[in-house]
Every structure is written in structure tokens, then in C-alpha cells.
Amino acid sequence: MACPRVIFLILITFFILQTAFSSSWQTLSGKPPAVIARGGFSGMFPDSSIQAYQLVNITTSPDVMLWCDLQLTKDGVGICFPNLKLDNGSNVIRIDPHYKERFSVDFTWKELSDVKLAQGVVSRPYIFDDVSSILAIEEVAKLTASGLWLNIQDSAFYAKHNLSMRNSVVSLSRRLKVNFISSPGISFLKSMKNSVKPTVTKLIFRFLKQEHIEPFTNQSYGSLAKNLSYIRTFSSGILVPKSYIWPVDSALYLQPHTSLVTDAHKEGLQVFASEFANDFVIAYNYSYDPTAEYLSFIDNGNFSVDGFLSDFPVTPYRAINCFSHVDPKRAKEQAKITIISKNGASGDFPGCTDLAYQRAASDGADILDCNVQMSKDKIPFCMSSFDLINSTNVIETSFRNLSSVVSEINPRRSGIYTFSLTMSQIQTLKPTISNLEKDSGLFRNPRNNKAGKFLTLSEFLFLPNRYSSLLGLLIEVENAAYLVEHQGISVVDAVLDELKRATTQQNKTSARTILIQSTDKSVLMKFKEKNKMNHDELVYRVDDNIRDVADSAIKDIKNFAGSIVISKKSVFPYKGFIILEKETNIASKLKSNGLRVYVERFSNECVTHAFDFYDDPTLEIDSFVRDVQIDGIITDFPATTARYRKNKCYGEFGLTTTGELITFANPMLLPPAEAPYPALLDSDVTEPPLPEARSQPPASSPSKAEEKAIEVPFAFIAMAILVCFFISV
């Protein structure tokens, strides 16, 4: 009996050790990676401002270190400022217009008291400019409990002005809690080696771009990265641009990771990675998700960096504490939120294609959506837009001659509409990936452009057979009145026929939820009448930003729908990317009246979020789920929300405070006030009944698209006749 007991204890011990080993960090110390806030929360407030440093304490924990780019004034006072020149990052040019170049050594500490800080990155909020003064290093030290990281970028510059950066740093390290001192200059680090206690303050060699030359050795930083044993003689760690670890090619795709972290750890060097910011362009592999990028440096199964230098410290802080070491297959869902795709995973693949749906299902979407369009031969299929120009390469084909203006749909621009082509013609087109507005400068995965194929509604209804994790499907029906009145096509009947056929074929679709969504009450009423659909299966979509919903409108909606879709701006109204108030009460009002509330559209790109969410799509999701308590998220990046549902610290951190950033703004820089969004009234919901389709459209009344299609070929025919005539003459 003793032997089995011993074996059992051995197995238990082995299991515990194996679990501990597998869950330990692959950092040099075995502890979680550190987070260093570069100039405070410099992604939001001006770098090195008191607001930037204070926001770090509000959004993270005392463990997060504050970074100070140390500069010296003419009278030797140490200040925190991101650049040698004061021009970029302050309003010094308005204070003293006489200097061509303005450095901190040109001013005494007292003279700098009138200089205010400004945002140095043009894409970031400028409304906080000219509010905060430059801080002395002693003032910054009072704001942190964990200690400071001092960066000395150019000690030789100050030596030319008879100022000793070394002496200043030594003095500061004796008076203040300085955890790390970094510099790209080897001579400076060597001079500091015997002046600080390595158990208290660590010296870190900062790498610049690989082609740049380090002055002491006259070697490139790229070559020095291959001589880590030499680096170990004067430092205890390295700070490298992230591309040293995960290279990115010219097309913005990741290359295989290097062995730098592993090699450095073998030499006893810590590795800190830099150049992280939520509003920087990152490799397409990350789908514009900053948390995914951080996780690739710490949770890849091969190595982990020892820390991050970030302009948005809340994101790496939560990536480390909430999303690392989470097994997506085994982890339980913490957040109760339904994920509905927006044209599939249309952030990664062309929308409404087989590949977009496949990615959405594998990424964790609960419900796949199909925006139903109709072909000329009355076949319903899935496509994100009524206009083929928006979703396909039709403009590159001979079908471009079918361009027409349909005033009922878009009176300002011509289009090539789905009802102008047969299904077989549409299937010859290549799908194109949807991008944000052109002026954003952000493009979605170009390698996936023109990948995949569009699905007919019949094929779409079979997807639950392929992806067993799905809870249901959502079918969106728009432009039904136009199609009936002008094209003689009943999209409602076409959808009902496909639903009946799918049920008859017993393809298991009937066992899953089918939702019908529309912006038109008349469409939803028609489904309710013809198919006896329960109002819980009908979803009413509000296609405008609204600030309130009248009680009479809610009562009307409840008669024909059980769910409602509203925009993000209807919940958190914002202008110039700054939320104007904490939140409206729309969601709670709708929910208290028994309606499920879905919100659209959630994307990963930083330009789609209000600044109050710190350019972090995960923090935005958290606010809508925990604060507003919506029922579902409609997203073109389902993976981001699916990962959020399984985070380890759900509910442990405080909610992101919305509507308060504006109180820190410079009133002179705020945009002018605008009229609030309108309220949704009963008159906005009420519509005349949807007419029945004609049996056949009148032969004498071709559509405008057909007129255009006939007109262009006729011109070619006429030209051919004339050519033949002149040849014969």
C-alpha cells in the first residue's frame, strides 16, 4: 500500500513543479516584465508634464516606473524634457523668438518657468498644450514610489557647455531613488560604473538604430548587438528598439524573431524593448491591436523581454497582468458579452467572404453576419455594400460601364450596384478589403486584399455546420423598398425562401438562432408577418448618432424588435476624439425597457477610438462591457473582444474614466461647441408598409443602371458602323 502512495505523491509533486515551471516568466529574473512610462503617459499629455506623470499613477500601479529624459539648464538644474532642443515639445519659440535653436542650456531654471509644454507628436491631442510647466527632476521623483529611470541621451553636448552630466547624475542618485540609468554612450556608462551601487541602480546601454555609429567604439549599434559579452562589462542590461527583436520588413510584415533576448540572457543582461505606442503603425500581423504586439514579446513560448518602454503604459501593464499566459482553449470566459461580426472578420480579410467568416469563427465570434444584397437574377448573397465599387474590383473590369446614379441610394455619387450584374458575373469579381477613411493613412492587411470569395445566402446559412462554436447568424436587410419599387425584387421573399429551404434540408441551421436586422421597421414587420418570427429574433438598427430615445419610440420598437443596434457615439458622444460627457443614459434606458442593446462598430485602429480610451481597443471594450453593460459588440476584429472575455483580471481594475480628459484641456484650444445629436422620436421609427413586389418589372422601364449599360455599348456599335462606312468608301 505504501508504494502506490509514494508514487501518487511523486506524481503530485511533479505536476506542481511542471505547472510552476510552465507558468513562470522567461525573463532574466523570472519575475513579470517591468513597465516604464516614457515621459509619463506621453501618448496623451505633453511628454514629461505633471499630468502625464500623474495619469500613470491613476491608470496603472506604483510598480510602473517613470522615465525622465534628463536635461540640464544653464545653471545646472536637472529637468525632464524629451529632447535636447526645446522647440519640439514646448512653446519656447513664443517665449523667446530670438534664438534660432533653443536648448535647455540657453536658459536658467528661473527663465524656463514661463515655458509651457506641448505635444511633440502631431497626431496626438494638442488641446493640452500650453498648460503644464517644465518639471525639475526632484518634482518628478515625488510622483513615483517605485523609483526613476533616468535617460542620458547626449552627455557630450553638456560637456561642451561646461556642465558635467556625470556629476549631476551621481548627485541625483544619492538624493533620489534612481532604479535605472540608460544612455546610448558607452563612455558615459563606463564613467558611471564605479559611481553607483549596482544593487540599487542599474546601468543600461541604449541601442539606437542599427546603422547609427556609437562614438566611443566607432562601431554601428547593429554590430555592437553581436558583441553582448563586451556590453556586459559596463552595463547590466540593454534597451533596444523593438525591431532588434521582431524585425519588420518594408511591407510592414513581421520577420522571424532574432535570438537577441536569449543571447542577452545568457550573458546575464536584462533586455528592455522600446518604441511602443498605441498610435504608432505596427506590423499587419497584429491587426492594429497593441495588446497583441506586447504579448508577442512576453508570451510566445520562446522568450520574454524584461520590460517595455511605452508612451501608453496602461496597455503593457494590462497585457502583462491580464492577458499573458492565458490558454484561449481552456480559459473560462469572464465577461458576458455577445460578439457579432461585422461582415465577418473584415478587419483582416475582405468582408463577407469565406475567409472573413472563417477567421471570425476561429477568432471567437458568436454570431456571423450577412448583409444581404440581390443580384440581377434575384439571387441573395452576402456583401458589405450595395455598391460593388466599395467591395470589389469591379472598376477594373468591363462592368465599369454599368455605372449609374441612383438618387434613392446615393444622389451624390454614381455606383455600380449589385442588381446590375447576375450572380455568375458577380462571382468573377475579386473582393477588396475595406479600409478606413483615406485621410487616416491606415490600411488593412494588403496581402489579404482580393482574397476569398463571396457567399450566396444559401452558402452562408450552412456555416453553422462548419463552425460548431457559433451561436447563430444575423441577416441584415437594407434597401428593400427601393428594390421592390424600382427593380421588382423582393429581398424579404428571397431571404424567407432561403431560410425555408435551409430548414427543409435539415442542415442544423434551424437549431441555432437566426436574427434579422434592418434600419427599416417595415422590413422587420414584413418578416414578422410572413414568417411568424418572434420579435426577439428581430433587430432594429439606428443608423444615426442619437443622444436619447423617446419613450414612444421605445414602445413602438418593442412591438416589432427585441434588440436594438446603436452607435458608439450614441453612448459616449465625442468631438475631436475627446468624450464630452461621461456617458448618455441611452443604453440603460433601452435595457430597462426590455431591449437587448448591441453597439457598433468596434475596430482596432487607433483613429476609431476616443482619446479617453487611450487609443487602446481593449480599454474601449472594457468601458462598454463593464460600465455601460451592453449586451453585444459588433466588430470587424472579433479576436480582440474574444481575448478580452477571458482576461484574468476582469473586474479587478478600475473603469476607464470617461468625460474627464476635457477638463484638463486648454480652453483656448478646444473646438467650438456643436449642437447635440438628435433624439430618436416615434416619427423616426414609423414607416409605411413595405409594398409587395411586382411579378415582373415592366419591360419598357429598364433601370437606370441598365440604361447606362445599354447606352455605352451602343456608342461602340455606332463607331464601328462609321468605321466600316469610311473603309468601304
Curated annotation (Swiss-Prot):
The chain crosses the membrane at residues 709-729. Expressed in stems, flowers and siliques. Gene3D superfamilies: Phosphatidylinositol (PI) phosphodiesterase (3.20.20.190). One of its GO terms (molecular function) is glycerophosphodiester phosphodiesterase activity. Residues 33-320, 337-645 form the GP-PDE domain. It catalyses: a sn-glycero-3-phosphodiester + H2O = an alcohol + sn-glycerol 3-phosphate + H(+). Residues 1-22 form the signal peptide. GO terms for cellular component: membrane. Belongs to the glycerophosphoryl diester phosphodiesterase family. This is Glycerophosphodiester phosphodiesterase GDPDL5. The lineage of its organism: Eukaryota, Viridiplantae, Streptophyta, Embryophyta, Tracheophyta. The gene is GDPDL5.
